[in-house]
Design a protein with these regions (language model features):
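PLP-dependent amino-acid enzyme catalytic core
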Residues: 1-482
């Protein structure tokens, strides 16, 4: 399997090179040149690590299959408390794929607990011995998951950039208290798009690469612009489907819809890849919060980032520049020239419009909708009162949207974070007065609902804060060169 840039068909690399580089030299994203076909009958009874090995092996063909099996087992057997790919019935026809039972209580753990192993092996496959410096822009969850995955690894350094005042207090403390001599964390005076754009500029700056090369350092990324982030996320779509069949909730071969709360389009794109591999997926439903640039795009074909940026109670979706959409545009248009043109328009004018054929192909696979904070809070309350099901603010957005677009097909909502990562907002949604402290809110939410508090979150206020530096977006380059 080879990978090419979304912007230049002549940029061809192996999977190891795609994972090590992260971003293509022309600014494009690496995509597979073909989709392996899933062996659904053979895969349906596999454990989560076994299924992960099969999916990974189809794309990462320059990795030894035995290594992939060992890496998957080391990642998913213990760290997810026996709940990797856990599917919970909410009510008839509606299910929640709970992706927050990993060590940092967010879906990013599925990729970022495995990806460090893939990166280290990629360096071995390619005979690379220099230090790898990983730059991460995060709206909250990716930062902690990446820090937890890469902390302490020899030959690896990681720098995380998050929007100051743009995360929950729990998310901030998860990053600010991270242990490890090879980790650095910076708050950026701006929003997520400022952080992400700053990091992308560093990757595209030849002078940065040249200076770091003199010091035997190369850059890589742990954001979902890196193929190594996406491929592990394909697995849980298959696993969820097989569990629904096993439970008798879905007939074999029956299409299932998936509703995904997303801002950067990576998690839902993994579902598109699963569909291309042969999984019976009906619609992939893109759920946005008030920053609804993706909803507008899927409806109209015009991507217009020239709009007000809103801080919401679902901060991991507070994004206006959705990086992974570029991959979908390449797959549905089949034209790197078109993609390069659209991305150039976005960089120059803040918007672009795709052709009618491209839009029709997107709408054939994707539906969409959006929900603001008020609707999300009402949904948290409704799901708890009606179904005794507690969800976080991002998952609530997806439940809202799922209800507006549901067909007769079973609907799986991807639950992307523990409700205890946003305890004040969840508690307020349940009609309680939220304390000022997230930790007091955790305790109150536990009393109110009886749902256990994840141990990794409950101890955060006892850990020393190591990182409290705030920088301007323009200083991201200097931080990358430190």
């Amino acid at each position: 399997m080879q990978f090419q840039s979304t912007r230049d068909p002549n940029t061809i690399v192996s999977s190891s090179e795609a994972i090590l580089r992260g971003l293509a030299p022309d600014g494009g994203l690496f995509v597979p040149t073909a989709f392996p076909k899933a062996e659904l009958e053979d895969w349906k009874s596999l454990s989560y690590p076994e299924l992960a090995q099969k999916v990974l092996a189809g794309f990462l063909t320059d990795y030894d299959s035995a290594f992939l099996g060992e890496a998957a087992a080391a990642t998913y057997v213990d760290a997810f408390a026996g709940k990797a790919g856990y599917v919970q019935k909410v009510h008839d026809g509606l299910y929640s794929l709970e992706l927050w039972h990993g060590p940092t209580c967010a879906f990013k753990d599925y990729a970022l607990q495995l990806m460090p192993k893939l990166l280290v092996q990629a360096k071995k496959n390619l005979g690379r011995t220099e230090t790898t410096r990983i730059l991460v822009a995060t709206s909250g969850d990716t930062g902690k998951a990446a820090l937890a995955g890469y902390a302490g690894l020899p030959g690896i350094e990681i720098e995380v950039f998050y929007p100051d005042a743009g995360t929950s207090e729990i998310q901030r403390l998860q990053m600010a208290t991270q242990a490890g001599d090879n980790v650095s964390v910076y708050a950026v005076n701006g929003n997520f798009d400022d952080a992400q754009t700053g990091v992308k500029r560093v990757f595209g700056d030849a002078s940065v690469a040249e200076e770091l090369e003199k010091r035997n350092i190369c850059l890589s990324s742990a954001n979902s612009i890196n193929w190594g982030r996406l491929v592990p996320q394909i697995v849980y779509y298959f696993y969820a489907y097989f569990r629904l069949v096993e439970q008798g909730n879905v007939a074999w071969g029956q299409p299932v819809d998936f509703c995904v709360p997303t801002g950067n389009f990576g998690d839902i794109l993994a579902g598109y890849y699963a569909k291309q591999m042969g999984l019976p997926v009906g619609k992939l439903v893109c759920a946005s919060n008030k920053n609804n640039v993706l909803t507008d795009f899927i409806k109209t074909g015009t991507y217009d980032a020239r709009r007000t940026f809103y801080k919401t109670t679902s901060p991991s979706m507070d994004i206006l520049i959705s990086s992974n959409l570029e991959r979908l545009l390449y797959h549905v248009s089949g034209s790197s020239a078109k993609v390069a043109g659209w991305m150039a328009d976005l960089a120059k004018t803040g918007m672009y419009t795709v052709d009618a054929e491209t839009l029709a192909r997107i709408q054939a696979s994707f539906a969409c909708g959006c929900a603001d904070d008020t609707a999300g809070a009402a949904e948290i309350n409704a799901r708890f009162e009606q179904d005794n099901y507690l969800c976080d603010t991002h998952t609530a957005v997806a439940f809202c949207v799922a209800e507006t677009v549901r067909s007769a097909a079973p609907m799986v909502v991807l639950s992307t974070a523990s409700p205890y990562k946003f305890p004040r907002d969840v508690l307020a949604a349940l009609g309680e007065t939220a304390p000022e402290s997230d930790f007091a809110a955790m305790a109150a939410l536990n009393v109110k609902t009886g749902c256990p508090v994840p141990a990794s979150l409950s101890v955060l206020n006892t850990l020393p804060v190591r990182f409290n530096t705030v920088i301007e977006p323009a200083a991201i380059r200097d931080a990358a060169l430190k």
